[in-house]
Amino acid sequence: MKKSLFLTLTLLLPLAAPAAAQQATVRLTIKDHQFQPSQPRAPANQPLTIIVRNLDSTAAEFESKTLRVEKVVAPGGEITMLIRPLNPGRYHFFDDFHQDTTDGDLTVE
């Protein structure tokens, strides 16, 4: 049984590597209550990872109604979100705690 499992995994592993390479990553930083970059881009129809690092001394809440995500980022902390494949378009995001200064748009093409 162990040999057949090992053989199966050995044969399937090369197929998994190209699929993992297809995932795009967007990295955002919050500093002085501003997203950097505030206008990131990502490829359409692929899973997406968004990483948000908060360099401010206060908490932030990354939120996007169009992306269907909402997560608190502690001061000096970092969060990672896995996003479903997206259609081309613009997806607005903001810091719910500082909406007047902290927002941006993800362009998917």
Task: Annotate each predicted stretch with a short phrase.
Residues 14-18:
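N-terminal signal peptide c-region/cleavage motif recognized by signal peptidases
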Residues 38, 46-50:
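Structural beta-strand segments of beta-rich domains
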Residues 38-40, 68-72:
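Beta-strand-rich interaction surfaces with strong enrichment in secreted/lumenal proteins
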Residues 48, 58-60, 102-104:
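Short beta-strand/loop motifs in extracellular/secreted proteins, especially
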Residues 52-54:
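Asparagine-centered strand-capping/turn motif at beta-strand->loop junctions
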Residues 20-27, 34, 73-109:
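Extracellular/periplasmic metallocenter environments
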Residues 1-7:
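Bacterial N-terminal signal peptides that target proteins for export
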